[in-house]
Amino acid sequence: MKSLGNNDKFMQEGLEYIKQIVNRRGSRDTKLLEICRFLNDKFTGFDWVGFYFSDNLKKELILGPFIGAPTEHRNIPFGRGVCGRAAVSGTTVNVADVMAESNYLACSLEVRSEIVIPIFKFGQFVAELDIDSHQSDRFGNSERQFLEQVGQIISVIF
């Protein structure tokens, strides 16, 4: 159970588990950290999994809970890097090869690909789910669709 492929059962079970996390008692950050841990544990190549919260007034992203190597990118201006680009576009950004990305903020020399899922609540951009991989072209269509559903599920806790 380390990669989705076309495994609809795995996908459904994962979404159900994330719904259970969201519906538990506890703080938002505790729930988000548990979701990070789940994604990191269940998917090979999800090497850094974390959330950035949106400060729409300052037009910047603020680092939230994450699993993986520490990052110096605690605040990211909208438009800067892959995360900042997703904040501006409001759409998922999937980068197969970060080395070919001119607007890339390097978090680690090991990172090869990245996917960022914007999260909205009542039409307002509130956060992002950011996942880095040490594998090139790690995130396929199945993973993208799954992660976008994760974003929809967790939007209620913002």
Predicted features along the sequence, with ranges:
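Sensory-domain boundary capping and coupling elements
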Residues: 120-133
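Juxtadomain coupling helices with adjacent low-complexity linkers
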Residues: 2-3, 11, 19, 133-158
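Intrinsically disordered, low-complexity terminal regulatory regions
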Residues: 1-66, 70-71
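Short loop/turn motifs at secondary-structure junctions and domain boundaries
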Residues: 43, 107-111
